Amino acid sequence: MGNEFRVCDDCQATNIKTLVPKLKKVDSCATIEVGCQSYCGPGRKKSFAFVNNRPVAAPTEDELIVKIEAKLNK
């Protein structure tokens, strides 16, 4: 089973136009779902994505990508 990324297109700290291409670089075969994730509180302040149904958040997109890569390499 492949990886799954879920991101919100409505949260203030998430920029879909830049985040989705970065996620594709991390895993080009992963499923990426864009839509509300009901994670509005943290999503107002931090970039986040759900990686295989687990939330991962960081102050910046670049830090988020580093955390996601670390999570997938475990």
Swiss-Prot record:
Stated name of the protein: UPF0741 protein BC_5384
Signal peptide: none
Lineage: Bacteria, Bacillati, Bacillota, Bacilli, Bacillales
Provenance organism: Bacillus cereus (strain ATCC 14579 / DSM 31 / CCUG 7414 / JCM 2152 / NBRC 15305 / NCIMB 9373 / NCTC 2599 / NRRL B-3711)
Record-stated family: Belongs to the UPF0741 family.
